[in-house]
Amino acid sequence: IYTLSLHDALPIWISSIGYSLCNHFADADFSSSLPYIRRITEQVLEHGLPLGICLNVNFPDTASLKGVRICRQTNGAWINEWKRSLHPRGGEYFWLTGEFDNYEPEAEDSDHWALGHGYVAVTPTQIDVTAYGMMNELKNWNLEV
């Protein structure tokens, strides 16, 4: 799953919107994001989303938002990503704490580029991890018995 904010909606094919601010402190200021949250939500209600499509909307941690960019997810990987913790009421949980290794920092059509340049990043997501580019190559392999 690309984003934890959409983790619960995707497995049951609910169309949804996940909003996240690139600030994980309890006193994070969402005020500059609120007009965008309202507008994006209104547009989704007006136009609808196809079944299973989830909009992943991320806001940079700045009061001076430059606008909206429709993006694809950045190609990269998390490094040292999970911290194991014990819940005060029992049990354990894992917190995403690592660093994102961006394999394409200059890709202006990616969400990380948009966020790094002060834009709201809107990425339509879905569950389909098929490697379509590999399908034709596999058809040329001798896989039959």
Task: Describe every region a protein language model picked out.
Residues 30-145:
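Electrostatically charged, flexible surface regions
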